[in-house]
Regions:
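Active-site phosphate-binding/coordination module
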Residues: 18-117
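Conserved acidic, metal-coordinating active-site core of Asp-based
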Residues: 95-97, 102-217
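Mg2+-dependent phosphoryl-transfer enzymes with acidic/Ser/Thr/Gly-rich catalytic loops
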Residues: 1, 180-257
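Asp-based phosphoryl-transfer active-site loop
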Residues: 1-16, 218
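Short, structured coil segments at secondary-structure junctions
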Residues: 53-56, 64, 170-172, 220-221, ...
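Short hydrophobic/aromatic-enriched beta-strand-loop microsegments
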Residues: 57-63, 120-121, 175-178, 224-228
Length: 257
């Protein structure tokens, strides 16, 4: 049986830390079963996290469903066209927002040509969990790519709901979503975690999540858990728990009945 977990505010706190209780539960689970991540985070971040905690993590859905991996092999991609990506970046820059793109190995690209290096350094200090950024400008980098883009990310300090609606009107042919209280991300139309799941070599799984972008999986899988801090609208789609460890414990007890 496969157990899939969302990362931010489900398995991992805002500092990127996983509790000892959750870590030990995952170790016990993976002695007999499979485990994986389902997240808006990029693949490089997920690989580093799995390595840090020494998780056996064969399945990964990353970038809000833009990519799916099985045993480190990319089995599915849903990517933004490069020309469209460049045009969207130019529109977003008019709003003076902190925009960035993360490549396949975890390098991040910022509008350094438009905003300057001082603003980049200020942003790095403001969001240290993102790590270091390249000195190459985001538009210059996208112009040099051959593959499409998994997602565009924006850090939004104020007026998130207002900006979310404006970008949804502006980019009607793309998925525009708030992935946290201060982030808006854009992916290709039709991209979601459930669509990515359907391309993994597995028919069923247990899933735990806490966000609106988890709803597509919560609605489609039978065996689901929702974190107790999740919006009330999500709680009807799974068993409410306080931690990943609690969900794994419930599943383990089912096996022993």
């Amino acid at each position: 049986m496969l157990f899939l977990s969302d990362l931010d505010r489900t398995l991992m706190d805002s500092n990127g830390t996983i509790t000892e209780e959750d870590v030990n539960s995952i170790y016990q689970w993976t002695q007999k079963h499979s485990f994986g991540f389902v997240t808006g985070r990029d693949h490089a971040f997920c690989m580093e996290l799995a390595s840090k905690y020494q998780f056996s993590c064969e399945y990964m859905i990353t970038d809000n469903g833009a990519n799916a991996y099985y045993k480190d092999q990319n089995v599915y991609s849903s990517l933004i066209d490069l020309d469209d990506g460049i045009q969207m970046c130019k529109e977003i820059l008019k709003y003076n927002l902190d925009l960035f793109y993360t490549d396949e190995v975890g390098n991040r690209y910022y509008p350094v040509s438009s905003y300057g290096k001082e603003r980049l350094h200020s942003f790095e200090k403001k969001q240290p969990s993102l790590g270091r950024f390249s000195n190459i400008d985001i538009l210059e980098y996208i112009n040099s790519r051959d593959l499409g883009l998994a997602k565009l990310s924006m850090y939004v300090e104020n007026d998130l709901d207002l900006l979310l609606n404006q970008f949804r009107d502006l980019f009607k042919n793309y998925e525009v979503m708030a992935t946290s209280k201060d982030y808006i991300e854009i992916t290709k139309k039709g991209t979601n975690k459930w669509e990515a799941f359907c391309h993994l070599p597995v028919e069923d799984a247990i899933f735990i999540g806490d966000g609106e972008n988890d709803l597509c999986i919560l609605k489609n899988l039978k065996n689901t858990y929702v974190m107790d801090h999740a919006p009330e609208s999500l709680k009807v789609y799974g068993v409410c728990v306080k931690s990943v460890a609690q969900a794994i414990d419930i599943e383990s007890r089912k096996e022993n009945v």
